[in-house]
Swiss-Prot record:
Homooctamer; tetramer of dimers. This is Pyridoxine 5'-phosphate synthase. It is found in: Cytoplasm. 1-deoxy-D-xylulose 5-phosphate binds at D14, H15, R50, H55, T105. Its main location: cytoplasm. The keyword Nuclease does not apply. The gene is pdxJ.
Amino acid sequence: MTEATRILLGVNIDHVATLRQARGTRYPDPVKAALDAEEAGADGITVHLREDRRHIQERDVRVLKEVLQTRMNFEMGVTEEMLAFAEEIRPAHSCLVPERREELTTEGGLDVAGQEQRIRDAVRRLAAVGSEVSLFIDPDPRQIEASARVGAPAIELHTGRYADAEDPEEQTRELQRVREGVALGRSLGLIVNAGHGLHYHNVEPVAAIDGINELNIGHAIVAHALFVGFRQAVAEMKALMLAAATKR
């Protein structure tokens, strides 16, 4: 595998915790899911500790930090509570995301351009504890350029509009937006990741984009795991991504 065809898979285990929290039980254990994902080829584990604690809990994050063999990508809102927790936990990677209590899932990208000083301060605090920061943003040139200005080393492009497109023409347009966003981010010296809404039937065109470093995928893998098991679900996704990346 050459550098040009290398692509990483970050497995988001939030929805293993969603199933647990639905009944207030101790199972299924997202930590076990994370370890299974690593054994199946995941390059990292993503968790989002939301303000309302709807799925991942603080204890999950603490345990994962101790047992992961790869690395944790800690998704977090830009709040004092989350910044203080991240400073304590010191995750290898942190991803700043927008967050609203009423949303089912993260619905859009972070408005970096509209709050540059706030984001710059958060990036500095996280970098000071050794965490590589990415910003979850729409594939919008204005937001990509602002991300570079605030000092974030990485961005994660929101692929939701591509994933939700209902007709082929719209999907093609949205894929092109992602492709152009990757090119711009790379030209500015940023590491470019992507994610949101990706599944087994739409991941390949995104994985084939030259310059994408990592895809973060969760819901589709957790759903598929109900039928084939968690390790198999992760392995199948990784295989699709690697096959697509060889076409770059």
